[in-house]
Amino acid sequence: MVLVTDLDASLDFYCNKLGLVETNRKEFEAGRFTLVFLAAPGNLDSAKATRSPELELTYNWDPEDYDGGRNFGHLAYYVDDIYATCQRLMDAGVTINRPPRDGRMAFVRSPDNISIELLQEGDAQAPAEPWASMENTGSW
């Protein structure tokens, strides 16, 4: 579960930019929070049948600061093409904090500053530009 501060910005990032799909949403008016469940496109059948693997976003309606790592450490996802994924994210305005210089791994951050690790499915791709010479940006 990841606590988010802006549900719309988080859904834009996780769905429109990262490519996850919303599988379920529950509003809890009495508790004043919303749960949104997301899955990778390749895991939709499993997510709908067994609710796994899914990412749960929790949005508390009343503003709250999540300091001291209360919202999470980092998430990791396998992707079919690390270079194409990073290019798509950059084109969507996402900063690549740790570029995939090795053709295997990259890091980005969500709107709530959650570190997202992207891993190449299968063998690493051959190092390629512009990634091989791209510097780190910020931290991950």
Predicted regions and their residues:
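Amide-forming acyltransferase catalytic core, primarily the GNAT-like/NAT-type
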Residues: 60-63
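Short glycine/serine/proline-enriched coil/turn segments at secondary-structure junctions
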Residues: 29-30, 65-67
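Eukaryotic phosphotyrosine signaling hubs
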Residues: 70-74
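Vicinal oxygen chelate
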Residues: 23-26, 34-37, 77, 83-140
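Short, well-ordered beta-strand elements within core beta-sheets of diverse protein domains
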Residues: 2, 75-77
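Core segments of cupin and vicinal oxygen chelate
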Residues: 1-52
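Short, charged, solvent-exposed linker or helix-capping segments at domain edges/interfaces
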Residues: 46-54, 68-69, 88, 119, ...
